[in-house]
């Protein structure tokens, strides 16, 4: 029997042609679903949504594996590709003995999925990478941004007081991938394993012929899922506590009626009443993380900041502006964002304020605010196949997630105390096709 040729198709209107299908694959498809939703809110002329099936009214076969991805190589040092395979829904979940912080595991496709399906998915993955290399990479390589990302990485120590983890030591940034390689984010470890020679061992150092894995997370990350109940405010029975007024929906700085409670002396707004992370905070935020993100990216990530005045003493950053002038702008002592894939990201609490439950408060508030009605991750779509408006089911539009390194026991305990449920393992991979 002849194996059908694998073709890669553009989806110029993914809201109609792809989002309904990805919603049907939740929670497994949540990183790609959220990345596409973010791209719809903030369109990029260099981004493409691709799949192994055409953007028509016909959905792919339920028995034939399929693959879809969001690609923007021009993000350079930041994650360039988010990819989802339908096999991920069938992949192994952590066994009951590994469903906690004291056990390590790696999600694989294993024996539950036929070798024929795995081989087909591997071929789809290779065809996708080859398509990106042949059709999208040349434009990126000819741009100034490719050279800048490789030769001029951003400084690990922006001119912000107290850089690093509260010790004055700059946080070293993750090195940029080579311009000819692709940085794939939140990639299911089962899918990444298909690029190894064994096809079954995630840690196998040998790769398929013509494939070079430059970097991957070993051990990988644990994907935690957050149902709305994990971060919603308790109902008072007086009004809809999880919505904002029409006036507030388009004003990130507008105080909302209710927020998650903070310890005494802490607040979610600065002294001017502004809610959320402000542009002059970006240098401080960047200085505290090893993940390179531009100010433009941070501005497009829903974020929440916490300020402190409990002992009537200014925090070390509160009297500084982003340009060093005195007394104009107050700086936060904690913050959290939802990334471009909707994941809880860049969570940070300054060392002097840790151990007070602030991390949990700012995490819940970031998800509550980021998944509010009318937000970028709560868009509805019109399904061509159904011919009617297709929105998320109850709670699906508010499904949150995050990634924690398998060996980071402390952070995993925090996520599980927040109500996070272990889903699978994933990784950030830098891969290059040779030849």
Regions found by a protein language model. Give the residues of each.
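Acyl-donor-binding surface of acyltransferase catalytic domains
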Residues: 34-272, 427-434
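Conserved acetyl-CoA-binding loop-helix of GNAT-fold acetyltransferases
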Residues: 117-138, 355-372, 376-380, 413, ...
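Conserved GNAT acetyl-CoA-binding A-motif
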Residues: 141-146, 151-154, 170-186, 370-405
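Conserved active-site alpha-helix within GNAT-family acetyltransferase domains
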Residues: 189-206, 374-397, 401-424
């Amino acid at each position: 029997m002849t194996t059908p040729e694998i073709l890669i198709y553009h989806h110029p209107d993914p809201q109609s042609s792809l989002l309904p299908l990805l919603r049907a694959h939740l929670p497994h498809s949540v990183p790609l679903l959220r990345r596409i939703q973010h791209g719809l809110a903030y369109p990029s002329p260099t981004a493409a949504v691709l799949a192994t099936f055409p953007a028509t009214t016909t959905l792919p076969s339920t028995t034939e594996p399929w693959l879809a991805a969001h690609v923007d190589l021009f993000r350079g040092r930041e994650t360039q590709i988010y990819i989802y395979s339908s096999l991920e829904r069938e992949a192994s979940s952590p066994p009951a003995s590994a469903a906690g912080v004291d056990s390590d595991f790696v999600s694989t496709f294993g024996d539950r999925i036929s070798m024929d399906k795995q081989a087909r998915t591997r071929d789809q993955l290779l065809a996708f990478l080859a398509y990106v290399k042949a059709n999208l990479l040349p434009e990126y390589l000819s741009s100034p941004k490719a050279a800048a990302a490789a030769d001029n990485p951003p400084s690990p120590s922006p001119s912000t007081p107290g850089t690093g983890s509260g010790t004055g030591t700059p946080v070293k940034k993750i090195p940029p991938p080579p311009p000819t390689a692709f940085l794939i984010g939140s990639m299911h470890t089962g899918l990444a394993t298909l690029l190894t020679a064994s096809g079954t061992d995630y840690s196998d150092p040998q790769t398929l012929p013509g494939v070079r894995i430059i970097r991957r997370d070993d051990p990988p990350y644990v994907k935690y899922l957050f149902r709305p109940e994990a971060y919603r405010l308790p109902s008072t029975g007086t009004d809809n506590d999880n919505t904002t007024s029409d006036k507030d929906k388009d004003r990130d700085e507008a105080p909302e009626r209710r927020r998650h409670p903070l310890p005494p002396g802490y607040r979610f707004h600065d002294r001017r009443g502004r809610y959320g992370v402000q542009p002059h905070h970006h240098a401080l935020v960047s200085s505290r993380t090893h993940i390179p993100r531009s100010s433009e990216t941070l501005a497009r990530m829903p974020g929440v900041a916490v300020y402190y005045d409990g002992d009537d003493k200014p925090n070390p950053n509160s009297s500084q502006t982003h340009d060093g002038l005195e007394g104009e702008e107050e700086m936060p002592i904690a913050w959290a964002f939802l990334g471009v894939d909707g994941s809880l990201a860049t969570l940070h609490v300054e060392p002097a304020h840790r151990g007070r439950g602030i991390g949990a408060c700012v995490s819940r508030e970031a998800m509550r605010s980021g998944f509010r009605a009318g937000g970028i991750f709560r868009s509805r779509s019109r399904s061509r196949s159904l011919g009617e408006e297709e929105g998320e089911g109850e709670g699906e539009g508010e499904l949150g997630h995050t990634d924690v390194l398998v060996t980071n026991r402390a952070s995993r305990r925090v996520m599980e105390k927040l109500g996070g449920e272990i889903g699978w393992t994933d990784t950030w991979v830098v891969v290059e096709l040779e030849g």
